[in-house]
Amino acid sequence: MDPKNLNRHQVPNFLNPPPPPRNQGLVDDDAASAVVSDENRKPTTEIKDFQIVVSASDKEPNKKSQNQNQLGPKRSSNKDRHTKVEGRGRRIRMPALCAARIFQLTRELGHKSDGETIQWLLQQAEPSIIAATGSGTIPASALASSAATSNHHQGGSLTAGLMISHDLDGGSSSSGRPLNWGIGGGEGVSRSSLPTGLWPNVAGFGSGVPTTGLMSEGAGYRIGFPGFDFPGVGHMSFASILGGNHNQMPGLELGLSQEGNVGVLNPQSFTQIYQQMGQAQAQAQGRVLHHMHHNHEEHQQESGEKDDSQGSGR
């Protein structure tokens, strides 16, 4: 027996598993700490993101307030800016041809809206409206509200204060103060007191008013403008100012009917009115010049008398 080989039955080394390395525990500890650090980092980032979102939402109202300050204060409701009248904000139904004609007139006249075109049409028909109703196109409620707000301001009608007066004494020029229909709204005068008859039958507007005796020559009506008074126009009736019933004017009927005849202003009557206005202006200017000349002569005469008295006193 070999004394050197004492451990014959020793297990070979390849059958034994190798011992674990010493650095493996350190690696596992590092991995575990890394996982823990990652888990710790995730909620911190979420919290940071949440804080950022909250801070951004806090800044948004500040930006809005700054924008509002730059744009200026908000305008209040403009519902009460205009005159309060009955029927305001009400829709008006009209025939299709009439609406189409108003739309066409708005484009032809260069108005901004159809309301301005309707206002223009009322302005053109002011004499007819006054003769038929006894008041102008401005509603009585608007006149009352404007008179209550400002006593010194008097709202005129759309035709520069067209005035009509009736001489109860039989047409004499020295009558009372003429009624201003544009300002007074025809107070004290009803429709029955005015002669009937202005508009003939027009399709779509019902039966017309009989046209007999419209402001006859003997009734003593006068027409005038503020600052002028033309008694001579009293011999002209509104029927002569407005075209007769048989004057067919195609294209001026607002497309309502080809047979209906709407009262059309007669240019010859307005020519006569303009001539009388010119004569009245000339007479007024002559009176003013005569008055000024008379005052100048009196002043010169007084100065001459003073000079004579001073010369005699010396």
From Swiss-Prot:
Basic and acidic residues biased stretches: 38-49, 77-89
Region (Disordered) location: 1-91, 295-314
Keyword Nucleus: yes
UniProt keyword terms in alphabetical order: DNA-binding, Nucleus, Transcription, Transcription regulation
Pfam family, one: TCP
PROSITE patterns the UniProt entry points to: TCP
Role played: Transcription factor that binds to the site II motif (3'-TGGGCC/T-5') in the promoter of PCNA-2 and to 3'-GCCCG/A-5' elements in the promoters of cyclin CYCB1-1 and ribosomal protein genes.
Identification of the protein by name: Transcription factor TCP20
Organism the protein comes from: Arabidopsis thaliana (Mouse-ear cress)
Highest classification ranks of the organism: Eukaryota, Viridiplantae, Streptophyta, Embryophyta, Tracheophyta
Gene name of the encoded protein: TCP20
